[in-house]
């Protein structure tokens, strides 16, 4: 009996994968609790300078840094820039809020700066079901950018996906 091999349609498809996990910060997500240097809820410049001076900056390499606890202390406007400049060259993003909030802002900035031309006219699969907690807002932002350049956008995996967008004329 001579059986023909079963074709692997997924491998043979012209789908181009777009994986938001490729943008996940290599150093992960790190948090700095503002209450650590704010006795009685008051942040003083001298305390912050001391904190920054003793900060082991290498531990923030390639990470997204969340400045948490802003609702528990009085936050001067210079605080974010002071910590961000101290971590420049180490952290990829510094922002105020919880990990999900700051991660959403990081993805928004990163995706806004991405080069989408590689997906022009392509059938793109926006991959889901990853190992990291990529924010839902990142999926929406990626779909928005992809719909501007791609022929077709789908969400999920190659073997099981949800059609999201199809350009006119296709």
Pin down the residues of each PLM region.
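Gly/Ser/Thr-rich loops at beta-strand to alpha-helix junctions
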Residues: 70-77, 129-137, 160-161
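N-terminal, charge-rich interaction modules
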Residues: 1-80, 84, 90-93, 150-152, ...
């Amino acid at each position: 009996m001579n059986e023909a091999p079963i074709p692997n349609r997924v491998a043979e498809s012209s789908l181009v994968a777009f994986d938001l996990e490729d943008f996940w910060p290599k150093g992960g997500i790190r948090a700095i609790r503002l209450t650590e240097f704010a006795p009685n809820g008051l942040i003083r410049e001298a305390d912050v300078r001391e904190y920054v001076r003793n900060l082991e900056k290498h531990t923030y390499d390639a990470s997204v840094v969340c400045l948490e606890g802003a609702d528990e202390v009085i936050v001067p406007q210079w605080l974010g820039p002071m910590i961000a400049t101290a971590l420049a060259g180490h952290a990829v993003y510094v922002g105020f809020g919880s990990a999900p909030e700051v991660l959403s802002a990081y993805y928004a900035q990163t995706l806004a700066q991405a080069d989408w031309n590689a997906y022009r006219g392509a059938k793109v699969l926006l991959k889901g079901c990853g190992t990291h907690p990529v924010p839902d807002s990142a999926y929406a932002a990626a779909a928005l950018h992809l719909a501007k350049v791609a022929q077709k956008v789908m969400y999920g995996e190659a073997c099981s996906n949800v059609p999201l967008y199809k350009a006119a004329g296709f």
